[in-house]
């Protein structure tokens, strides 16, 4: 069998990985202006950006490709590529101007060493670079934020100014004993005078600047910056409240000011990556007087403000603050001229049948409005799928654009003048690029999709969704009658299922989910002959707010039992080899994997844990998300929390370290030394405990890697070591 050959020959697995890892993924798309041909036809260009792993350069490369879409205003007549792909090097951000005649690009260039790189803001027009500004040399601010949390690059409606977010310029600092700074002739009076803005402050060279945690380590104090394209002048906007950090900004109607999200950073910052619950609000700062106005509830959390095409309305997502990191959100509408805020879509406690289960997305697409400024289009997890939806902002009615179609998952890249650009994939189909027009209100389910880039299905992979109902003794008393799901991938060419080993993968979060989309590792393992079980235990997103709220206070118990129940059900129904079952999980998935080999040591023959949570007690004082430790253990979080014996006992009771004496499963640990979310000392603590008890354990420590272990060199090495570990402990 092919499975046995690949398991016994690592080079075969490496060749398979090299092939499948070449599958690119879409990262962005934008639509050019509408053009009328000399014969009266209409067409638009679609500019797409992709990423792909390059194993020879050991990096993720970015490239772009353009397509032409001919249409009649309501449907696509013809579509196809307009040339080959071109690699884009150094681009951090790019944005088309409102008219489509110009494009702004933030680019890094310069030294080979990371710290020597410079940032340039370029303005392109037609076939030439119109302007280029060396932001690093101008020294108005620090590095520009290119992330999707704070970062933005926004054209003014007049197309004369650019708005972006950058790190606040830090004062120069030096030692008291730096010779060139000493001035022995200065009098006491001169020493007491205020320092000049550009004069170095003595003794401040080691002052601590608190950052925003995982993947945001260089980002501390963001400021809003405006570039005047004609004059080249850069101004840092004033009026932003001192207690918030601004981001996700755009120009207000008429360019009278700037709308932005402000995140509270007092009394200190918590990690913001993957955390939609950070206290924040929507603000407007007037450019003429510098007055700042609060536009939303300041006690909650907001993100993704998006201005309608008619410049009359702003929609945004709103979440409870200091609760589970990710949960069902509300969609709000702010009328710019009446100043009235209205709720469009509320939190959904439970999904009723096949109905809408709520909004579960961390960001709305930059382009999400219909042409008439009445409907908003977005993608959201719905159980174990991700679908596209249109919501009428006047009535609040939500309609699926993809229900009843192919059972994969969709992602909206953009919509402009009702032309949608979307990505579609399944567990055995890499991402495809599709376009289609948003139908009139009431006919949303009749979208006609046209493929611009069609991926080839990966053969010999069969997949499906399993609906699971916990047994009566595992019901949650407060949130009863909740079900959950698992996605099962299995080789379709296996003549004898009893010889098929299985890898069980619980997701991280815990409030995230697996969806029926393309994922490299599960597809790879399935091609090698493994069945792969992806478990969306109770607490996963997409199943209603009640499911999410059922887990805090029950981690290490409810989620563990759900995964074990899913494993037992699938083994019973599919008759896979129960002697060869392995676990593989990262973060909270690693937490569950280590729990399972301690609570059910007879079930699992191998375990791979990536940056796992091991001891919630010791994690509390070292992670960038101490609120996670409290909330998921079942306690409210407050910034002034001090250790409490009862709380610490509960944390320990819910930690995998408690079950160390029962563990006998061989464990492969993979840790990122720069992980701020689950510091690598967590895995090291587990490693020492296993070594002391003679349990087979191997530790891989990646020096420059972060929580996701997603760098190309790290990802490829971790996969090959996973294959070797499975081969050693499951056999072929």
Curated annotation (Swiss-Prot):
Disulfide bond entries: none
One Pfam entry name: APEH_N
Entry's localization field: Cytoplasm
GO BP term (any one): proteolysis
Residues with PTM N-acetylmethionine: 1
UniProt key word Nuclease: no
Species assigned in the record: Mus musculus (Mouse)
GO cellular component, one term: nuclear membrane
GO MF term list: identical protein binding; omega peptidase activity; serine-type endopeptidase activity
Enzyme active site: 587 (charge relay system), 675 (charge relay system), 707 (charge relay system)
Subunit structure: Homotetramer.
Reactions the enzyme catalyzes: Cleavage of an N-acetyl or N-formyl amino acid from the N-terminus of a polypeptide
UniProt record similarity statement: Belongs to the peptidase S9C family.
Regulation: Homotetramerization is required for activity. Tetramerization results in the formation of a gated channel which is involved in substrate selection and substrate access to the catalytic sites.
Phosphoserine modified-residue sites: 185, 187
Chain's role: This enzyme catalyzes the hydrolysis of the N-terminal peptide bond of an N-acetylated peptide to generate an N-acetylated amino acid and a peptide with a free N-terminus. It preferentially cleaves off Ac-Ala, Ac-Met and Ac-Ser. Also, involved in the degradation of oxidized and glycated proteins.
Keywords associated with the record: Acetylation, Cytoplasm, Hydrolase, Phosphoprotein
SUPFAM superfamilies membership: alpha/beta-Hydrolases, Peptidase/esterase 'gauge' domain
Protein EC: 3.4.19.1
Protein's name according to its UniProt entry: Acylamino-acid-releasing enzyme
PANTHER family membership: ACYLAMINO-ACID-RELEASING ENZYME (PTHR42776:SF4), SERINE PEPTIDASE S9 FAMILY MEMBER (PTHR42776)
């Amino acid at each position: 069998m092919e499975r046995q050959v690949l398991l016994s020959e690592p080079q075969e697995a490496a060749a398979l990985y090299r092939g499948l890892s070449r599958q690119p993924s879409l990262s962005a798309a934008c639509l050019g202006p509408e053009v009328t041909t000399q014969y009266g036809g209409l067409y638009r260009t679609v500019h797409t950006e992709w990423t792909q792993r390059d194993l020879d350069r050991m990096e993720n490369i970015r490239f772009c490709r353009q397509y032409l879409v001919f249409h009649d205003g309501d449907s696509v007549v013809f579509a196809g590529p307009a040339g080959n792909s071109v690699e884009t090097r150094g681009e951090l951000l790019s944005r088309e101007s409102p008219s489509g005649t110009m494009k702004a690009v933030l680019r890094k260039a310069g030294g080979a060493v990371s710290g020597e790189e410079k940032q340039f803001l370029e303005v392109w027009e037609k076939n030439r670079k119109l302007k280029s500004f060396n932001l690093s040399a101008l020294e108005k601010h620090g590095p520009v934020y290119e992330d999707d949390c704070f970062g933005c690059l926004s054209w003014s409606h007049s197309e004369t100014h650019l708005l972006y977010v950058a790190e606040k310029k830090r004062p120069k600092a030096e030692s008291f004993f730096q010779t060139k700074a000493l001035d022995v002739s200065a009098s006491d009076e001169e020493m007491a005078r205020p320092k000049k803005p550009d004069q170095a402050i003595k003794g401040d060279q080691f002052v601590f600047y608190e950052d925003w945690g995982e993947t945001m380590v260089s980002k501390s104090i963001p400021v809003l910056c405006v570039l005047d394209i004609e004059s080249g002048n850069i101004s840092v906007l004033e009026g932003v409240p001192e207690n918030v950090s601004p981001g996700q900004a755009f120009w207000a109607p008429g360019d009278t000011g700037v709308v932005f999200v402000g995140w509270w950073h007092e009394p200190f910052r918590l990690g913001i990556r993957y955390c939609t619950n950070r206290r924040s609000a929507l603000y407007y700062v007037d450019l003429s007087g510098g007055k700042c106005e609060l536009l939303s509830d300041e006690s909650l959390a907001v993100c993704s403000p998006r201005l309608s095409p008619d410049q009359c309305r702003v929609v945004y997502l709103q979440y409870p603050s200091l609760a589970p990191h990710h949960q069902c959100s509300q969609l709000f509408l702010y009328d710019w001229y009446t100043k009235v805020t209205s709720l469009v879509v509320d939190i959904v406690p439970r999904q009723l049948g096949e109905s809408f289960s709520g909004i579960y997305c961390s960001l709305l697409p930059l382009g999400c409005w219909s042409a008439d400024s009445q409907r908003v289009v977005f993608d959201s997890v719905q159980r174990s799928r991700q679908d596209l939806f249109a919501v009428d902002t006047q009535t609040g009615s939500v309609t699926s654009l993809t229900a009843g179609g192919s059972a994969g998952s969709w992602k909206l890249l953009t919509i402009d003048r009702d032309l949608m650009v979307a990505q579609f994939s399944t567990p055995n189909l890499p991402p495809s690029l599709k376009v289609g027009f948003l139908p009139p209100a009431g006919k949303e389910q009749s979208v006609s999709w046209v493929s611009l880039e069609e991926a080839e299905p990966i053969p010999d992979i069969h997949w499906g969704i399993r609906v699971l109902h916990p047994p009566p003794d595992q019901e949650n008393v407060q949130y009863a009658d909740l079900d959950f799901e698992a996605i099962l991938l299995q080789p379709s060419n296996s003549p004898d299922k009893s010889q098929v080993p299985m890898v069980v993968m619980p997701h991280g979060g815990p409030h995230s989910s697996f969806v029926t989309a393309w994922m490299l590792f599960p597809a790879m393992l399935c091609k090698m002959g493994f069945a792969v079980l992806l478990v969306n235990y109770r607490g996963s997103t997409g199943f209603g707010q009640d499911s999410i709220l059922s887990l805090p206070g029950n981690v290490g118990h409810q989620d563990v039992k759900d995964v074990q129940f899913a494993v037992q059900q699938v083994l019973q129904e599919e008759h896979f080899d129960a002697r060869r079952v392995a676990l593989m999980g990262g973060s909270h998935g690693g937490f569950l994997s280590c729990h399972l080999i301690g609570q059910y040591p007879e079930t699992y023959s191998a375990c791979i844990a990536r940056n796992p949570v091991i001891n919630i007690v010791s994690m509390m004082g070292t992670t960038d998300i101490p609120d996670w430790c409290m909330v998921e253990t079942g306690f409210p979080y407050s910034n002034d929390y001090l250790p409490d014996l009862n709380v610490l006992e509960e944390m320990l009771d819910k930690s995998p370290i408690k079950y160390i004496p029962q563990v006998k499963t061989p464990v492969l640990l993979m840790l990122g030394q720069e992980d701020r979310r689950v510091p690598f000392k967590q895995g090291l603590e587990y490693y020492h405990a296993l070594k002391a008890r003679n349990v087979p354990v191997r530790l891989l420590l990646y020096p420059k890697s972060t929580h996701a272990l997603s760098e190309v060199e790290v990802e490829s090495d971790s996969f090959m070591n996973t294959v070797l570990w499975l081969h050693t402990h499951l056999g072929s």
